Amino acid sequence: MVVGASRRARRVVRRQSGKGIVYSAIDVKKWAEKIPTAAQVRPACCSRCGAASRPLGGVVVLVGHGLRERQVRGPAGPRGQPETRVIVVRRYRCERCGGLTTVLPRGLTARRHYSASAIGLALCLHGMQGLSIGETRQRVCTWPVGFETERWTTLISWLAAVAEGRLFPCVRPSPTQASQRRQAERAAATLCSLALATDELEAQAFEGAALAA
């Protein structure tokens, strides 16, 4: 899959998630500070047909196809305030099959507004730190909290996605009878185990979720 790709390309683009989406090794924070060039994050191959993006001695097959805005919700750090940011992601078009490939920075999740790190933080706060759903919502949710502070269906939908393997597939399914808090605890513990950070659990979950997305 990396025939003709440079070492840099192999290092920068790490894996795919669904049709047409590829994740970069560059995290959201660094990406937002300086948008990488088309060459820096060009995938090794087309996400649709598998054609090498730069065949050895040949012309570029996967060419830049412009930029696209992408909304990112949630705290920018484990102790940050919830916010909504807009970043620009890169798109590429395959000259062979015409397919489009979008490259996202590490830490985003396909077809979700909240970053993987924000989701991981929420799972940690509720499952491992013992915060209520309302308290977790205040730490992560970007929308103003109304009267129903203990209701947050978004967190429940994340737990369902984890259970079905659609989100953080590295997390093993919880027992059928497990409570939502126990499900969140299992998921958060798995994410923490992936992190390089050795400080507080919230930082571990934040980093581990970005790596697991």
Where in this protein do the model-derived segments appear?
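Short, conserved DNA-binding cores of transcription-related domains
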Residues: 1-107
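Residue-level marker of positions within ordered structural domains that often coincide
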Residues: 51, 99, 127, 141, ...
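Short, basic interhelical loop/turn and adjoining N-cap
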Residues: 130-157
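A generic secondary-structure signal for well-formed alpha-helical elements
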Residues: 126, 144, 163-166
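Long C-terminal interaction/binding lobes of large macromolecular proteins
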Residues: 2-44, 51, 155, 159-213
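Short, Lys/Arg-enriched anionic-surface-contact patches
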Residues: 102-118
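Short, conserved catalytic/metal-binding motifs centered on acidic residues
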Residues: 94, 122, 136
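Short, amphipathic alpha-helical "recognition" segments used to contact nucleic acids or chromatin
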Residues: 115-130
